[in-house]
């Protein structure tokens, strides 16, 4: 199977490439930079350039495109001078890929987010829920990307994830390990609830999907139950052997961020098992393996 992966400089794209290579598939990575130090099979691609997208994907002629590239700086996306750029990447870039996939009759896997919903209540979001109410620019543009995929293609997977961490990039765990080293106590919000997603585990699932034709919308995070960022931090410090005290605070007490954050990031993952996909391991287990991987 020949697979093109976008955004391979990021946490998820990096792990998807490694998983594809491990399974003996022909994996071609792409990103906006000229070259990539990790992968030989690499092509520079600016997904906002429609002609370039069409040319590159048509020439490669993959069986599947795994589209991980995105603008993910949630707060920065709120700046007036950034909104069009964010939309160009998350919405238009995704549409460029979807239209080319349609032309060459190729599967597409699009990575999305719980931010397409309003983040309220306590009920886990169903993958087929169409009650979209994004809280911020990032969520709105990712939703536009989802619609570009679902309106143009039949052979697609839209996979929503949350609270992502991986080896190749910045994430909440790395931030907390640094902060916990410097200060005797840290304040972390306890009223935003969800489940972490380890990109190494998610990559395995995405390649399983690429090998199948069980198309549709899915939610995929690690198992292990729904937690707050406070709970997550307590477990991070426990596993890392930190004595740092963690103080729970509300989002309101913590202070405003530019972009509104969802209180309810609970994602219902039942559809994975219903369609024969193997769920991800628990987040506690994922955290333990991750800390070993980054040699903590």
Residue ranges of predicted features:
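Rossmann-fold cofactor-recognition segment
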Residues: 34-49
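SDR active-site strand-loop-helix element
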Residues: 6, 30, 65-69, 108-113, ...
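Conserved C-terminal active-site "lid" loop/helix of NAD(P)H-dependent oxidoreductases
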Residues: 228-234, 250-290, 294-296
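NAD(P)-dependent short-chain dehydrogenase/reductase
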Residues: 147-194, 200-201, 208
